[in-house]
């Protein structure tokens, strides 16, 4: 599959360009996002001061990639854009590394006034043979984790880690409801919550997913909207409109709802505002996580034996199959694409 060796001229007189295999957004289609997904040769990363190029060994899919194909966070003038936020691989010195995909958090490698972005919003992503990121964004991969496992952590698992431990403020023994078991963030929240000594409740429309949630450590898994045996201290919300009312109603007085996504839409029919103010509930938005939190998450997984839940591993040239499965909602855990 490798195309990174030769150098190809584009046209007579143009500079020669090194190319590589990549999976990319060629067009924006809000209704049929996969219509814009293509794979083939793209220019390899160019050398840039303060940036490093990593050879990708594994990269994982996120709903962010589907949203990008719909044009959310990805402007037409940035196309074609190589997709993929997450990756683990080997840097220019042969070190095994993991990428933190929030660019501009620190100003490293970008201008001081450049707003924060996630890979694929401004800069080419990880579904390729190579990716270039600010050197500051590269972390050592713990030897205990495989490339496939490590590639699951920087987006969905980091998001869940920040939601639980930074924004929900939960402690061992507290209770938490995770909506939408099966999704990448939700699955991570179940596993991390169990490992941290929380009582985890989960929901899913799918009986097989509810069963898997129990196997991962949830004390109870119910259908969306079902009454829980107790009011919970916190809710981890990524589904959005379809589960919002249930999330608010499931909280104890003074409880915290942390939301990082809205895969079912962002306009719930009932905002439950009266309940929010009367019970003094906290609603906290959460996006991704910091480099320090990713370091903590990597160490946590290495030390505890906690591992990401991987639904399927596919070679990168079969990325479309992975996108189709993610769009259908049939996943439990992460889909990982492997390089070579």
Regions found by a protein language model. Name each.
Residues 10-20, 291-340:
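C-terminal hydrophobic helical "lid"/dimerization subdomain
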Residues 43-60, 72-112, 119-125, 142-144:
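Glycine-rich beta-strand-centered segment in the early N-terminal region that forms part
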Residues 227-235:
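A short acidic, Gly/Pro-enriched loop at the edge of an enzyme's catalytic core
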Residues 203-206, 238, 261, 287:
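N-terminal Rossmann-fold cofactor-binding loop
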Residues 1-87, 133, 340:
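Short N-terminal strand-loop motif that marks the start
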């Amino acid at each position: 599959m490798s195309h990174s060796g030769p150098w190809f001229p584009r046209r007579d007189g143009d500079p020669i360009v090194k190319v590589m295999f990549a999976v990319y957004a060629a067009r924006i289609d809000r209704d049929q996002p996969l219509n814009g997904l293509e794979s083939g040769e793209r220019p390899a990363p160019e050398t840039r001061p303060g940036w490093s190029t990593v050879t990708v060994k594994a990269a994982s899919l996120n709903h962010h990639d589907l949203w990008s194909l719909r044009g959310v966070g990805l402007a037409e003038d940035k196309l074609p854009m190589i997709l993929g936020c997450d990756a683990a691989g080997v840097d220019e010195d042969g070190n095994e590394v993991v990428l933190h995909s929030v660019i501009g958090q620190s100003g490293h490698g970008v201008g001081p006034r450049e707003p924060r972005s996630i890979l694929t919003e401004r800069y080419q992503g990880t579904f390729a043979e190579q990716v270039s990121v600010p050197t500051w964004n590269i972390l050592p991969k713990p030897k205990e984790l495989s490339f496939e496992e490590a590639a699951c952590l920087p987006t969905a698992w980091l998001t869940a880690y920040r939601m639980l431990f930074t924004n929900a403020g939960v402690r061992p023994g507290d209770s938490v409801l995770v909506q939408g078991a099966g999704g990448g963030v939700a699955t991570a929240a179940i596993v991390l919550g169990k490992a941290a000594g929380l009582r985890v409740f989960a929901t899913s429309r799918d009986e097989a997913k509810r069963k898997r949630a129990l196997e991962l450590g949830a004390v109870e898994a119910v259908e969306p909207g079902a009454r829980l045996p107790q009011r919970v201290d916190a809710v981890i919300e990524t589904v959005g409109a379809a589960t919002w009312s249930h999330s608010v109603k499931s909280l104890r007085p003074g409880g915290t709802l942390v939301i990082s996504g809205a895969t079912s839409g962002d306009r719930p029919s009932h905002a439950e505002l009266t309940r929010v103010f009367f019970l003094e509930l906290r609603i906290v938005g959460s996006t991704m996580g910091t480099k320090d939190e990713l370091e903590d998450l990597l160490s946590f997984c290495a030390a505890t034996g906690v591992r990401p839940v991987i639904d399927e591993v596919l070679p990168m040239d079969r990325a479309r199959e992975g996108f189709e499965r993610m769009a259908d909602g049939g996943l439990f855990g992460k889909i990982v694409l492997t390089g070579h």
